Amino acid sequence: MSTDNKQSLSAITLAAIGVVYGDIGTSPLYTLRECLSGQFGFGVERDAVFGFLSLIFWLLIFVVSIKYLTFVMRADNAGEGGILTLMSLAGRNTSARMTSTLVIMGLIGGSFFYGEVVITPAISVMSAIEGLEIVAPELDTWVVPLSIIVLTLLFMIQKHGTGMVGKLFAPIMLTWFLILAGLGLRSIIANPDVLHALNPMWAAKFFLEYKTVSFIALGAVVLSITGVEALYADMGHFGKLPIRLAWFSVVLPSLTLNYFGQGALLLKHPEAIKNPFFLLAPEWALIPLLILAALATVIASQAVISGVFSLTRQAVRLGYLSPMRIIHTSEMESGQIYIPFVNWMLYFAVVIVIVSFERSSNLAAAYGIAVTGTMVLTSILSTTVARKNWHWNKYFVALILVAFLCVDVPLFSANLDKLLSGGWLPLTLGIVMFIIMTTWKSERFRLLRRMHEHGNSLEALIASLEKSPPVRVPGTAVYMSRALNVIPFALLHNLKHNKVLHERVILLTLRTEDAPYVHNVRRVQIEQLSPTFWRVVASYGWRETPNVEEVFHRCGLEGLSCRMMETSFFMSHESLILGKRPWYLRLRGKLYLLLQRNALRAPDQFEIPPNRVIELGTQVEI
């Protein structure tokens, strides 16, 4: 490898440390404290400490190192990852019924992510701010207001983009991981006996000794791997090699040293269980560590916020969420986006969670169900890809699936015990998002089918218009068409009511491909249907935002000249009426009407100059 390539790999690896590992990297703030806080019926005992440390270490090895970094990250769509990408890949070579099942799984996984992102900023920032209690116990009443202030500032800067701030993420997180390692190593040197917990037999002994209680305690252990989905979801930003290199060279050693350092401290000073992370540090270092922890948790929260923006754009482009305003905050990086509606809805949800739960330890009970539920679905979808797309041996794939589920299912089941104490929160949010996504998709399909029931052939209409043309007026008219070979409603209504047609007519269809990006060479396809009619199909990936001005610039390069300010864009605006339905479908219909009313209008969605748009209304019963 050349020197330049090595430097580039080092830079990307450093950047991956700053973005990908923020969530899992701040887990030491609260994980071991929750494991040994006494809620499971045992205190800081040697066997319990060794058992939890062994479980945490081997979860990091099996779930993160083996399952995600080695297996799941093999499943990419043009380098992109994430649960919806996995859903798309898994459904490519399967039957229609199987594809429907896989789509439902993918949507549930995506919905769980929305439930998780409400909790991550709250628990991360609160855990860091709670370090104030070690410095000055009388400041404990300031934890909630300070957490809200920090997160308010974070959500307010989202509209300015994170490009400049992002440059600071990597060095701050690298410093964070080095401090984690240093604090842990210092404690381990003072009590090296704790390293015996690396032996997986301590995990086995933990289950044998504590039986049912040990199973329930898995709900706390899983806190050590929250954020693992980010490794796969952010694969498109950094690539597989940098993410893997960052994990094995920096993140895994640092996390292991810190967890075992906390364990060594607790074996000598059980009273440190009130906050073992901050008590690892010497007294003089508490305030700098508190500041660094606050910065690290803000970075972890930023990564989650950026993730929900990306997931939302993907869901919108794939037709599972209604169109909404998406702002690009960087001219250089297409992945840096800001969605105002999502930003402020997430902010208010996070503030409500902080005020309601008050302590990170209370919020820990809500964490885990969404994470482990997504892990189960990822196992099923990724092994489906291995069998159907990679054509691996079915017995080998079955063995892999069983191995994954033997870990994922117990973790998910253990977290169900948290349902009444907070686990209902991400589950409820996930269910709400699942209902919204499936409602939009199914009702949108019903609407389009209803609109296209007129049965007229596009070819027949064009032939008729060319043979017996109506009054033709100068200029170019563009009619947005949702599907090929379907007559746009706006065209029918223009002919019916205005009885005129422009000299040149373009039927424009914007299509979302099953890929993150579409090369400019394949962006536009032009077909002349008659002397005065053209069909233009513009293809975009689900990580791209359609732009009509760009489309016609490409058309001009291919011989179909079209000036935006001399062109009229005709669009149909549907006024929807609910027909007779069963009560449950009527409720879904009302939800769809609400979503439709608040959806971004097509001119804004496709960046068409407002003064060039003509909307023709039509009433449709669904």
Curated annotation (Swiss-Prot):
Q: What is its main location?
A: membrane
Q: Does the keyword Zinc apply?
A: no
Q: Name one Pfam family in it.
A: K_trans
Record keywords, A-Z: Cell inner membrane, Cell membrane, Ion transport, Membrane, Potassium, Potassium transport, Symport, Transmembrane, Transmembrane helix, Transport
Q: Name one GO molecular function term.
A: symporter activity
Q: How does it sit in the membrane?
A: Multi-pass membrane protein
Reactions the enzyme catalyzes: K(+)(in) + H(+)(in) = K(+)(out) + H(+)(out)
Return the GO cellular component terms, semicolon-separated. Answer: plasma membrane
State if Membrane is listed as a keyword. yes
| Cellular compartments annotated | Cell inner membrane
| Transmembrane intervals | 9-29, 49-69, 103-123, 137-157, 165-185, 213-233, 247-267, 276-296, 337-357, 363-383, 396-416, 419-439
Source taxon at top rank: Bacteria
User: Which residues does UniProt call coiled coil?
Assistant: none
Q: What role is this protein assigned?
A: Responsible for the low-affinity transport of potassium into the cell. Likely operates as a K(+):H(+) symporter.
UniProt lists the family membership as follows: Belongs to the HAK/KUP transporter (TC 2.A.72) family.
Kindly provide the name given to this protein in its UniProt entry: Low affinity potassium transport system protein Kup
Give the originating organism. Answer: Citrobacter koseri (strain ATCC BAA-895 / CDC 4225-83 / SGSC4696)
Q: What is the lineage of its organism?
A: Bacteria, Pseudomonadati, Pseudomonadota, Gammaproteobacteria, Enterobacterales
